[in-house]
Structures are given as C-alpha cells and as structure tokens.
C-alpha cells in the first residue's frame, strides 16, 4: 500500500489509513491524543530498534563522506556517537518507514521534525497529503541558541583560564599522569571516580582535569598538590575563534533523504557550544602535551573527537597513551569501533585497557587491533555486588537520566502498582525526575547496596541493568516509544526487553534468574599490574583481553 506522511497538528483523523505511528521527533515529542490508540501500529519499538541495529554501516559510509568538511574534527555525527548525535535514530526512522511503505497496510506516519519529514517524503511509496512543516522557525531558533551558547562558553572559558593560569608553574617535563573529568565522587585524598585509589598506589602519579571541570571543583581537587586544570594551558587568543566554532557539513550528493539528514545534523550540532568546547579542549591539551611531555598518560576512553586529537598529539611528543574503557561498550556504542577512526590507528590510543574480556571481544569485533586490547579490570564496578534476589521482594525501577525515557517508564509501571506488585522507583543520580508517589509506587534514595532483596529490576539506560544481572536478579530492559534506548550490555549478555504494552505480561511470567559469570565480563583491577603499567608502559607487562 503506501504511507501517508503528516504533522501532528494536521492529523485530525486516520483518513484512508489503516494504522498509524508517530516518530515523536518534533518539539512536543508526544503522541497525539486525537488518534485511536487501538489503531496504533504494533511493535514499532521493536522494529525501530531492529532498524537501528541495521544502520551502522550506512552511517559509517555517510560519515566517511564528511572527511574534509570545515571543522569536521569537532563534530560528533562523523564519529558515530550514539549518545551525542541522533543521526542514527533519523536513519532508523527512515529505514522503518521505507519498510512500512512496502507493506499491505496503509499507514499514517506523524513527523514534526522538518528535516526528517523531508527525508521521509523522498521515499518511494510515501505521500504527503497536507503541508510540509516550515524549516525557518527551527533554523532561526537553532542559530540563536548556538550564538548564545558559544557566548556563554567563551565567558566561562575566559574566567577558568584566568583562575587556573598559576597551575602552569608546577609542570615539569616527563612523569606519569591520568586525565579525568571533574567527577563529584573524586577527592583530594587520592581517590578518583575513574581510577579508584590509583594515585595512592602509584608513586608520583599526577592528575590532569578535563576542561568540562569548573574552577571551583578544580580548585578543590588541586588541594592535593598533584592535580592541575587543563584550562591553565589554553591559548587565550583562541577565544574569538570559539564564537565561530561549528561543523559545516556538505550534504552528500545522490540521495535527497540523506542530504536532508546531514543538514539537520549540522544545524543541531551548531545549536550548542559543543564544538567550541571541543576546540578549546584540543587547544589546552595540545599545549599541555608540548610543555609537559609526559612519559605515559591514561584517560577514560570513549573515542570522542577530543580523544582522537589527544591520541595524535600525544604520539607526536613521544607520550605513551592508554585509553581506559570508561562507558560500557555495548552493541549500540557505535563510536567505539576502530573503523570509525577515519585516519586509521593514528587517533587510537597505543593501548585500550578493558574492564574485562567480554569488552575486549566486543571491541575486537569492531576492528580494534588485538594487540592493543588489554584486560585491566573495572575500578567503577569492582567487588561482588551487594544487591540480592527474593521472589517476594519489590520491583526496582531504575530511571534513565533522560526525562523523556524516565517519564515513559513511570507511566508504563504506575498502572501495575497496587495489584499485588510493589515498585521502588530510583532516580538517576545525575537527573532528578519528579513524579507522584502512590500505593505500591514509592520513591527510594537508597544506594543499590542498601536496598532490600529485589524480585526484578527494570532499567532503560545506564549500568543499573548490568549491576542487577551480575547480582543474579532478573532484569527487564525497557524499550521506549519513539526512541531507541542505547543497549550498553556486552554482546554475550542476553536479557528480556519489553515495551510499555508488554510490561504487564513480562511481570506475570515466572522470573528467570540470570546465570551471570562475573569473571567472564569484568575482572578485578590488580594494583601490581597497574603500578607496572605506569612504571614501564611496556607491552610485555600487559595481559591479552581478546
């Protein structure tokens, strides 16, 4: 049959369509109340995730065509960053819509995003019975936000540079370093959120703070006498150029739909200050490397644009650079594949230190050279989990840090409370999400280790699902409507995924206890190994992770 493409505002009814679904990509990001929910196309969440699983190679091919575009090295879309860019989601919606257009049903597709709307309209079998949404309001808003965001960023950078500049005096060439973010759980007593107590274990190890760390936090951490802020090493003459720091992609020729989505990615990335801050980070780290010339440095590695530039600059001054796996790799963390480094291994760390063997295998499957992969242990998830299972315990809902996803989780679970089920709802530590408590649906602020025995854990994004899995607690991965929740579990971990429609049935089924083998996923960090790693930096001291 065909697809009828419309905006939410114009969708007064189904018309000639048999079913409908919404991309939920516009400013409202919500489904219309006017359309009958019984006629909503079923299984959209499942099919959308399947489409997202299938678009990686297409995204990579498009990213390769951006090489040479102005400021391409500052952008997230060319790195296939699924957290920092929603380009892959746009490709998935287009793929799903193309598949629906080949089916037997006539389907109404709602889309309020003007770029995605035009990309879908270019597909075979898609008809636009009404008006196409205007581009200019979104363009005007994006440009205005971009200028304001960059102006604010320049002001912050100027202040941080002035406040931190004295730190330059304490830098002597050589030595051992870690480069970290200003995490609230780090302190000036030798504990770091990313590297545990390594600063107490390795004599002479110093800490360098990323430019995302504000001055007050940097000053508190610098009280140890071994921590300095990268802001101190920036070139103040660069500040005017930060106003103009934005990726300007040239849409690829030959595919109208792809061209619209590339334009969209460029506009969205320019609507904030991410490119400006990446340029400042690259300036600071390059100047620091030329001055400090460290022997060895490690940092929480996620293969972001600034990290690729850092690896190139470190190698140019003879520094051995070690990327320590920060976020879990997972099947949707596309940017961590070595094939996304468009300059080959020049922008890869000399060594990638993995949390465990499973992560080494996943990275190897994405093209990371085996000889660079090292099993180093997990500082952030070390030790046996203190969560426990009870078939009669409450169900924990570990909310996502994305309010769009957290809202769907609470709306899906709340109607199921008070029917013999007890839900404990825990906010993400980095995102407060206000919600109304009710019978059997209560908030908890307890850490995982202090919670009562749980019968299940429902999660959407983050590592709470992995922690529960390792503790032997049945886990349900919530699949939201309108978006793919990034699956961050290793490829060998298979758990049940459910959407809002299937949640009740999944909870009615007897729980299946996971047969978790912690040793195959995560290993304990060995202090002797880490000391040798920083003392020698020699490949002979490393353990194969693949």
Regions found by a protein language model. Give the residues of each.
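Catalytic-core helical/loop segments in enzymes performing group transfer/polymerization on anionic/lipid-linked
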Residues: 1-546
